[in-house]
Amino acid sequence: MRPVSKKAGKSKKTEGNVIALNRKAGFDFFVEERLEAGLALEGWEVKALRAKRVNLTESHVLVRRGEAWLIGCNITPLSTASTHIHPDPTRTRKLLLHRREINRLIGAVDRDGYTVVPLKLYWKRGRAKIEIGVAKGKKKQDKRADKKEQDWQRQRERLLKHKVS
């Protein structure tokens, strides 16, 4: 009989790896394409990410001169981690992408109404990764329709729950 490996049965993506979610992006945008990118971070930022002191809500991605940048992401520094430097919590951070991925982003953003937004920040093999999405902004009526659909799903779940019991 062969021994079963320790990794058997474990899922690759666990909830413990997620640092931050941008839930507002799902409400404000239709996400059409998703990409994974690395982040160029400083030491104090990595420590703050381990403590989950990050906010993606007001951030966006800008492609300038063939490079992708994360703008508006707030990483609050730990008081013990940054004693000899003056950290900037909202500094512009470089995203690490392949050239073809950057070209795809440039082509997507050139279309009218499209933008690139960060969706999720997580750990992968000890490295901080960010999931970005090519998205199109929702109009007010789209947001209302989504809200209505969510309410109906909740109500349906409640009805089914009471019906089964």
From Swiss-Prot:
Name listed for the protein in its UniProt record: SsrA-binding protein
Chain segments carrying region Disordered: 135-165
Organism expressing this protein natively: Halorhodospira halophila (strain DSM 244 / SL1)
BP GO annotations: trans-translation
Function (record text): Required for rescue of stalled ribosomes mediated by trans-translation. Binds to transfer-messenger RNA (tmRNA), required for stable association of tmRNA with ribosomes. tmRNA and SmpB together mimic tRNA shape, replacing the anticodon stem-loop with SmpB. tmRNA is encoded by the ssrA gene; the 2 termini fold to resemble tRNA(Ala) and it encodes a 'tag peptide', a short internal open reading frame. During trans-translation Ala-aminoacylated tmRNA acts like a tRNA, entering the A-site of stalled ribosomes, displacing the stalled mRNA.
GO molecular-function term, one example from the UniProt record: RNA binding
Disulfide bond annotation, renumbered to this chain: none
Gene (name only): smpB
Compartments where found: Cytoplasm
UniProt entry keywords in alphabetical sequence: Cytoplasm, RNA-binding
Biased composition (Basic and acidic residues): 143-158
